[in-house]
Design a protein with these regions (language model features):
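Structured catalytic core of nucleotide-sugar glycosyltransferases
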Residues: 2-140
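Histidine kinase transmitter module recognition
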Residues: 21, 39, 52, 121, ...
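Residue-level signature of catalytic and energy-coupling elements of molecular machines
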Residues: 18, 36, 92, 107, ...
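Hydrophobic helical membrane-anchoring modules
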Residues: 2-11, 189-333
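Acceptor/aglycone-binding surface of glycosyltransferases and processive sugar-polymer synthases
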Residues: 73-81, 85-95, 111-193, 209-228
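Short conserved micro-motifs on helix faces and helix-strand junctions that flank
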Residues: 21, 79-81, 170, 243, ...
Length: 333
């Protein structure tokens, strides 16, 4: 999996780990850190915040490494380059120590103030707490409509029931995290992976805020790529669909051919229709190319998996213990 550096620390276990993957978010990180620490300081639990830098080109990493907190440990993980959000989340999960683990985006669209409610559900015995967006402020109608259509398509194709309008903002128990960390796959669609282990799940509705500042790092091309990853990572039905299309077209062609032969022999009519034949040939050619493309997507993923490269590489790790916890440890020592 990833290249994990061994970092000596004096706090081997905590109740809650909050993972924040980010990429070029220097504008919003100070506000996020302030709101996170305010929420966590009000909790009676031991906490850690794990910031995962996905190869930022601005000063985000240096900014995070300067963060401190009185009530929770601050850990910073810097990846060697931009491996993508799925890899950054995986790095955070592998480095987490909490009995409960929460993933949250850095852009403050997911309110940190909901963390106590998520923990309350976890204490009721739920292993996964999904946060379902009832409203998506700051998003165009096209993005909302396309997201809804994608989730319907995905749940039609895959066996796992991936909740609609649930992003990466969720809570996972230690048991679920440990199972996810054992998965060897490199092409990761985390929304599906979070659901795949199963276990007892709860869903909390919330209103997703608009982005605090800056611009989203996800354009439509990246979203389409993520959608393709989601479908090909959890379903082989597109391959079966190509086979089904082939059978249907071959059957239709055979039936139409038999009809032409029967019509010519019985009525002596001359077969005409050059334009219609061209349309049929072009349609068949398009379907064949589409099927080859679908097959190529799966073969490409097999090729990537077969190389066995690490999902990510860690360039730097730093840690600042919580001031109050550190003082308590010193007194016990």
């Amino acid at each position: 999996m990833g290249l994990v550096n061994s970092v000596p620390n004096r706090l081997k276990a905590v109740t809650l780990s909050v993972i924040v993957p980010y990429y070029n978010e220097a504008e919003v990180l100070p506000e996020l850190h302030q709101r996170l620490t305010e929420v966590l300081s009000a909790l009676p639990d031991s906490c850690e915040i794990i910031y995962v830098d996905d190869g930022s080109s601005d000063d985000s990493l240096q900014l995070v490494e300067s963060f401190t907190a009185e009530s929770c440990t601050i850990r910073s993980i810097g990846l060697s380059r931009n491996f993508g959000k799925e890899a950054a989340m995986s790095a955070g999960l592998e480095h987490s120590r909490g009995l409960a683990v929460i993933l949250i985006d850095a852009d403050l669209q997911d309110p940190p103030e909901l963390i106590p409610q998520m923990l309350a559900k976890w204490r009721e015995g739920y292993d996964v707490v999904n946060m379902q967006r009832t409203e998506r402020q700051g998003e165009t109608w096209f993005k909302r409509a396309s997201a809804a259509a994608f989730y319907r398509l995905l749940n039609t194709l895959v066996k796992s029931d991936i909740p609609e309008n649930v992003g990466d903002f969720r809570l996972l128990s230690r048991e679920v995290v440990d199972h996810i960390n054992q998965l060897p796959e490199r092409n990761r669609y985390m929304k599906g992976i979070f659901v795949w282990p199963g276990f007892k799940q709860a869903t909390l509705p919330f209103q997703r805020d608009a982005r605090f500042c800056g611009e989203t790092k996800w354009n439509y091309l990246k979203l389409i790529g993520l959608a393709v990853d989601g479908i090909t990572s959890f379903s082989i039905k597109p391959l079966r669909l190509a086979t089904l299309l082939g059978v249907l077209i071959a059957g239709s062609a055979f039936g139409y051919g038999a009809f032409i032969v029967f019509k010519t022999l019985l009525f002596g009519e001359v077969v005409t229709g050059y334009p219609s034949m061209m349309v049929v040939q072009l349609a068949l050619g398009g379907i064949q190319l589409l099927s080859i493309g679908v097959l190529g997507e799966y073969i490409g993923r097999i090729f990537i998996e077969s190389k066995g490269r690490p999902l990510y590489l860690v360039q730097s790790v730093s840690e600042k213990p919580a001031t109050t916890q550190y003082q308590q440890l010193e007194k016990r020592a």
